[in-house]
Amino acid sequence: MHTAIIAGITTFILTIIGIPAFIRFYQKARISGQQMHEDVKQHQAKAGTPTMGGTVFLLASIVASFVIALFSGNLSSNVTTILFILFLYGLVGFLDDFLKVFRRINEGLNPKQKLFLQLVGGVVFYLFFERHGGGDMLNVFGFPLELGFLYIFFVLFWLVGFSNAVNLTDGIDGLASISVVISLGAYAVIALEQKRFDLLIVIFSMIGGLLGFFGFNHKPAKIFMGDVGSLALGGMLAALSIALHQEWTLLLIGIVYVFETASVMLQVTYFKMTGGKRIFRMTPVHHHFELGGFSGRGKAWSEWKVDFLFWGIGLVASLITLAILYL
């Protein structure tokens, strides 16, 4: 446990040192920064804010986790597998951000390119996971289900789905970073109960990095994590649930990401079926609350108010999950 705490503190320090340096690099290089294409007026002031901050906490977490796990004798196949997915999905996000920021390609990677790279990363993760005894048993609400060769399709769906879900959640200052901290906190408890001290190192390391990043990402944000951060974090959560053989728990622990994704899917489907009508003022659904509270027609909510609502939902859902598992 103390090794995991050291990993968290190390990544926290590396992040709070690295982020200011990264911001200065942005400013000196006169990089355009984040572009805003949303219809939320209060977001227009954020145009030009440095992005790709996820690069800092991601690299800090990967390096700190690897080195500390290595020297503490905890560099297991589980650790390398999680670090592997962090790197692969972070790389996909980095390419997407790089095209947007440095090449001025507004779309970045197109959806097909991004999906292809995510699927490739998922296949590599599956092969690595299976090679090290991962198995093909799916935990469905506490009941084991043998999937056989179909397990790879579940893994791909889980990794791609949740990486994109966290990406959708990263739409207002601080929302994704603390939401993921809460989710990782729940998985830290599960890992501790399973005596998976190797995974605790990676979990605590990322928590430390995100807490350090939040100091610069809360409203008003000085930097955004970008796709490099959000895609990697979503992939990590999915990979953790698989490595801990508690896949179903991510539906509750990650309820915020599920809610955000479902809102987009419902909005698009309803819009097409009704010829232009909407369920929400704007999706992902955190923008609906920004524009007009619960009803979408009331007084606009501040980002802090939306943040605390969603963090609260995530925290309660995580506590319920842990209660189901251990009480």
Curated annotation (Swiss-Prot):
Cofactor dependency: Mg(2+)
Subcellular localization: Cell membrane
Signal peptide positions (record): none
Domain of life: Bacteria
An example Gene Ontology CC term for this record: plasma membrane
E.C. code: 2.7.8.13
Enzyme class: transferase
GO molecular function: metal ion binding; phospho-N-acetylmuramoyl-pentapeptide-transferase activity
Membrane topology of this protein: Multi-pass membrane protein
Entry's transmembrane regions: 3-23, 51-71, 79-99, 115-135, 140-160, 172-192, 197-217, 223-243, 248-268, 306-326
Annotated catalysed reactions: UDP-N-acetyl-alpha-D-muramoyl-L-alanyl-gamma-D-glutamyl-L-lysyl-D-alanyl-D-alanine + di-trans,octa-cis-undecaprenyl phosphate = Mur2Ac(oyl-L-Ala-gamma-D-Glu-L-Lys-D-Ala-D-Ala)-di-trans,octa-cis-undecaprenyl diphosphate + UMP
Alphabetical list of Pfam families matching this protein: Glycos_transf_4, MraY_sig1
UniProt-listed InterPro entries: Glycosyl_transferase_4, PNAcMuramoyl-5peptid_Trfase, PNAcMuramoyl-5peptid_Trfase_CS
Keyword Transport on entry: no
Biological processes annotated in GO: cell division; cell wall organization; peptidoglycan biosynthetic process; regulation of cell shape
Keyword Cell division among UniProt keywords: yes
UniProt keyword terms in alphabetical order: Cell cycle, Cell division, Cell membrane, Cell shape, Cell wall biogenesis/degradation, Magnesium, Membrane, Metal-binding, Peptidoglycan synthesis, Transferase, Transmembrane, Transmembrane helix
Pathway: Cell wall biogenesis; peptidoglycan biosynthesis
Main subcellular location of this protein, as a coarse class: membrane
Role description: Catalyzes the initial step of the lipid cycle reactions in the biosynthesis of the cell wall peptidoglycan: transfers peptidoglycan precursor phospho-MurNAc-pentapeptide from UDP-MurNAc-pentapeptide onto the lipid carrier undecaprenyl phosphate, yielding undecaprenyl-pyrophosphoryl-MurNAc-pentapeptide, known as lipid I.
Similarity comment text for this entry: Belongs to the glycosyltransferase 4 family. MraY subfamily.
UniProt-recorded name of the protein: Phospho-N-acetylmuramoyl-pentapeptide-transferase
Taxonomy of the source species: Bacteria, Bacillati, Bacillota, Bacilli, Lactobacillales
Name of the gene this protein is made from: mraY
